[in-house]
A protein has these predicted regions:
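Short, acidic, Ser/Thr-enriched surface-loop or helix-capping motifs
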Residues: 249
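Active-site bordering "gate/hinge" segments
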Residues: 1-239, 261-289, 295-336
Length: 336
């Protein structure tokens, strides 16, 4: 809606019914997949040590395979739509953080600034905290994170930038149809990267389901033996790399837990992008008023335009449900 002139998806639906129907169809397929394995639409409840408490039947997998294959055309058209949108001409290079080789859960992570050699290391919790700093700051309920004292970005754009050659053939093909090239340094391209990933992960789902159908079976989960220990992992969530760590006592009770979400890691980078974007908007408005009356900058950069561009940038990161809405109240202080 941001790029097509609508205030919301609901407003867009009557004007662009085909696009809206494709989006709803893709949402239905993702819901089917999550329900079949995780037990509900979001935040799976069936995961257990060593597997899942609910395993889809062969018949269910065959039905899912049909749904996934049928969704492929919708995903490709959606990616083409996002690749054709008129994104703001704004760039700010940062550090791009993802797992290596397009794995969802893996042993190596990549930090790439595309100005120097990419940094790759084993995804251990100890190494993560040697590299990442956490800081509590005034005026924010979220901690600020940095690599080497600098902000970084995680999520779809980081994954596509770092692992473009590991995309599925069709995902890579639809990406190359667009004028946007990867690595891309505009945060607005994150939404296009997400659309590319729709194609990639439908291809991944097809391969996984086809592999599972002939050998799916229900097996009892292994009996657990409790002991005092700490476990940690890095995995890719849709919004980026998730770090989680748990310390258990001798009875298997969680005594300490540490979770660092992708949105939390992106907060500092969002703020740096906003600062840079505002500087560009103000500079552009100032250039427009050159030689004109003093109040022309105010006319060429109205408050409504500022709010729209700021919200568009925040939504490009897809940080949460609430941030997908129109949320910003902007207070302007005029300096004479």
């Amino acid at each position: 809606p941001d790029y097509l002139g609508f205030a919301s998806a609901i407003e867009m639906a009557p004007a662009r019914p085909a696009d809206f129907k494709r989006a709803m169809a893709l949402k239905r397929v993702s819901t089917e997949l999550c329900l079949s394995v995780g037990g509900r639409e979001i935040n799976a409840v069936t995961a257990a040590v060593g597997g899942f408490r609910s395993v889809p039947t062969k018949a269910r997998l065959e039905a899912l395979l049909d749904s996934v294959k049928n969704a492929k055309a919708d995903a490709v058209e959606t990616a083409r739509l996002f690749g054709s949108l008129d994104y703001p001409a704004f760039e700010r290079r940062t550090q791009y953080f993802s797992l290596k080789n397009y794995l969802v859960s893996g042993k190596e992570v990549v930090l790439n600034s595309f100005g120097r050699n990419a940094k790759t290391w084993k995804a251990s919790g100890k190494k993560f905290f040697e590299e990442v700093s956490e800081e509590v700051v005034d005026g924010s309920t979220a901690k600020k994170h940095a690599f080497g004292g600098k902000p970084y970005l995680t999520g779809a754009l980081a994954r596509v930038n770092n692992n473009f050659s590991f995309l599925s053939d069709d995902a890579r093909e639809v990406a190359l149809e667009s004028s946007i090239r990867f690595p891309s340094f505009t945060p607005f391209a994150n939404n296009f990267a997400q659309a590319i990933e729709l194609v990639h992960f439908l291809d991944e789902a097809t391969e996984l389901i086809e592999e599972l159908i002939p050998k799916i079976r229900v097996e009892p989960l292994h009996a657990l033996e409790f002991r005092k220990a700490t476990g940690r992992a890095l995995s890719e969530a849709p919004r980026g790399v998730l770090y989680h760590e748990y310390s258990l006592d001798e009875r298997g009770m969680v005594r300490d837990a540490r979770i660092i979400t992708p949105t939390q890691q992106n907060v500092r980078n969002i703020e740096e992008d906003l600062k840079a974007l505002l500087r560009e908007l103000i500079a552009s408005a100032s250039a427009q008023r050159a030689g004109g009356p003093p109040n022309q900058v105010r006319r060429s950069l109205p408050k409504q335009k500022l709010v729209a561009e700021i919200e568009k940038l925040v939504r490009a990161y897809d940080p949460c449900f609430s941030c997908a809405a129109h949320f910003l109240e902007l207070k302007l202080n005029k300096i004479k």
